[in-house]
Structures are given as C-alpha cells and as structure tokens.
Amino acid sequence: MKWDKRVVALILAVMIVCPLFAAPAHAQEQSILDKLVVLPSGEYNHSEAAAMKQRLEKIPTSILDALYSKGVKIKLTQGAITNEPELAYLKGVVPRGWEGTGLTWDDVPGVSERVVAVRIGYSEKGKGHNSLNLEIHETLHAVDRLVLNEVSGTDEFINIFNKEASVKYKGDGYVSAYPTEYFAEAASLYLYSDATRSDLKDSMPLTYEFMAKLFAN
C-alpha cells in the first residue's frame, strides 16, 4: 500500500511539474521560423541573423505556418541575393521601379519569389531600400501572393491604395506607384510595433482598418 501511495505521489508531482516546461508560444513561433529560415553555409553575422529572425516573429504564427505549407523559404544571405542559385536569373536585370538608377538586382538587398531572399545587415531603411524593415517587407510580399491570394489586387484594396498611398509616399515612384508595394509596406507598419501601427492608424485610417480586419483572422 505504501508503494501505491508513492506511485500516486510521483504521478501527481510529474503532472504539476510538466506544465512548467511546456513550450511557450514564443518557442513555438521560433520553431516555425527554424523551418522557414535558411541560414548561410559559410561565415555570417550570427547576431544580426538572429535579430532578423526575431523581427520576423512579428508576423502572426498562423501566417508563417501557411507560408511553410506553401513551400516558402526565407533565405538570409551574406552576399548578393543573385548569388543564390534560385535567383541567378536576375543577374544584371533592372528591377521594376529602378529604371534609370543604374542599379540591377545584384545591388538590391531583398526579393520575394518562391524563395524570399534578404541580405544580412541590410534590414534598416536606407540600406539599399526604402522599406521600414527589409525582411518583413519581402516576406509580406510572399504572404500577399501565396497566403492571401493577392489581396493587394482586390478592388477594395486598390480603392484604398488610390486614396491613401500618396499620404506618406507621394512621388516615390515605388510604394505610391504599385499596390503590391503599398500592401507590403503598410502591412509592415501594422505589424512592426505599437508606434508604427498607431502612425498607420492616424495617417492612413482606411489602410489601418483593412489591415486590422485582415490580421484579425
């Protein structure tokens, strides 16, 4: 009988202790990013790559799961994105909206195809791009195309684009010119931080409401 009591006590102890070691939501999110993100095989800035992964956590886990189910990979590259085998066809090609700059895809730090490729150390605005955050912006292009069925091309979003894209991006020839770019940048503002979300709400309220409905599901 004493042995039975010990067994019961042990089982109870295990039941109490185990929840303490259950994987938190943060760990689950890291897990899907470990599946999505491909790191360079050679030398690279480990701390910056880790920071990029951490920023990608701002994208809802359900959306990251959907990207993974579509076979998407997010490659963090040490060198030019066109050095990646999947993107070699872009060498020497001028990106849309970059005409007359003298630059090609070899100079651009990020792209979103079936593979999302972003250069390590180029996350911030002004480092070869004008996005709030490079890795989030490029990943959200893939979300738009592959998870949200090109929601940036719907009549509802085009109408919002026509009304509000010029509020912050007038004359930039890029975000204000292409609904896909406006979507990726506006969605970045919505997801990046409380401050950027508040700014989106104040300056582009129709866009904010669209994003709020979109990411509520």
Curated annotation (Swiss-Prot):
ATLF-like domain residues: 30-216
Signal sequence residues: 1-27
The keyword Signal is annotated on this UniProt entry: yes
Region (Plays a crucial role in substrate specificity): 112-115
One GO CC annotation: extracellular region
Quaternary structure (record): Monomer.
Protein name per Swiss-Prot or TrEMBL: Pro-Pro endopeptidase
Source organism per UniProt: Paenibacillus alvei (strain ATCC 6344 / DSM 29 / NBRC 3343 / NCIMB 9371 / NCTC 6352) (Bacillus alvei)
